[in-house]
């Protein structure tokens, strides 16, 4: 690997960097970026597509969630003006994405979080975004474990509501931090990032 000196953005006053995009600031910087080369898009300015987690400013506060950007070359990026396209959690960043229901089942109201993996699904003819989420514990404890949700889009801007696809369900299970998916030879292959704090 070679680190190119692009000189697009400085870091602590040093312009000799390979930084290609900066976040909006706030409580975080852009994070969890996933890039896809899209040869199907007729617009050369959208050949490279980027999904990332960032905090978007609003009148009252900041909203974390899915942000996207486009590039003709993978180096010079233009952020989409609408952000976030999918909001992380529901409401304020401190509000959990799952609220245990009366039956104490931790599988309601899925939302996205800050680990993202993109793929083009040739079977469904759409983009698929696999992201981390959080589930509450069966006893109601919040942010119990990490799990995986999926959202899809045909235009990379309008995304479906996240759908839970993989979650731990035993106290001794690890946590599911991310999922990279590819389609090959008629099969979907997922490479699961598992966290084990034991």
Named regions from a protein language model:
Residues 1-174, 182-198:
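Beta-rich carbohydrate-recognition and catalytic domains
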Residues 177:
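The feature captures the catalytic groove of carbohydrate-active enzymes
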């Amino acid at each position: 690997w070679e680190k190119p000196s692009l000189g697009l953005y400085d870091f602590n006053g040093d312009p000799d960097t390979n930084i290609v995009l900066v976040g909006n600031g706030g409580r975080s910087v852009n994070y969890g970026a996933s890039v896809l080369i899209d040869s199907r898009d007729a617009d050369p300015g959208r050949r490279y597509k980027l999904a990332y987690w960032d905090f978007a400013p609003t009148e009252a506060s900041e909203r974390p969630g899915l942000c996207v950007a486009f590039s003709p070359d993978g180096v010079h990026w233009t952020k989409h003006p609408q952000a976030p396209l999918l909001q992380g959690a529901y409401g304020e960043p401190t509000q959990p994405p799952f609220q245990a229901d009366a039956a104490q089942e931790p599988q309601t109201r899925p939302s996205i979080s800050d680990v993202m993996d993109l793929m083009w699904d040739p079977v469904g003819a759409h983009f698929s975004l696999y992201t981390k989420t959080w589930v509450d514990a069966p006893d109601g404890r919040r942010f119990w474990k990490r799990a995986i949700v999926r959202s899809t889009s045909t235009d990379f801007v309008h995304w479906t509501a996240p759908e839970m696809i993989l979650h731990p369900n035993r106290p001794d299970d690890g946590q599911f931090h991310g999922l990279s998916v590819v389609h090959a030879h008629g099969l979907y292959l997922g490479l699961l990032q598992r966290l084990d704090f034991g």
